[in-house]
């Protein structure tokens, strides 16, 4: 009888230990916040504001979805790019993309592709020539950023070096670009 009781107790303890085993939801690797002037939580959202054309007033807003509105730290910063970099983003914010723990931003009116860290601190910028036309939208895959250019091209850019590697001619005035199963689709 004692063997049965011992076996039953062992099985109950095993069941209880399995029941209380769980995974932590805070195992995400920390973001690269190097150079930040603002303390930011792990969960964050960036919102690209286009601004008014020809006015150099595009911006990036920051929102902390899990932070209490009464928290002493801001859960919303209207223009985090300006706060972090002490300069305006540029003319006509067009597209924003998170890729490989960085944020890439197309500023169409200023003909720029910006690479920001996860705290919106600028790390690199690529200026497009007037013959390229203004950049519009982007997609990313395998360490490359693909940018549609108003001149009728798609530029392939190395995401780490921010150097243009190649161009592909497409129809005039391409807009959206999407990567799916190793193929790019341009509209």
Which role fits each region the language model picked out?
Residues 34-67:
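An edge-strand/N-cap motif at the start of beta-rich repeat modules
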Residues 32-37, 88-98, 132-142, 172-181:
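Repeated scaffold domains used in trafficking and secretory/extracellular systems
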Residues 45-55, 98, 105-109, 147-151, ...:
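Conserved beta-strand positions in repeat-built beta-propeller and related beta-rich domains
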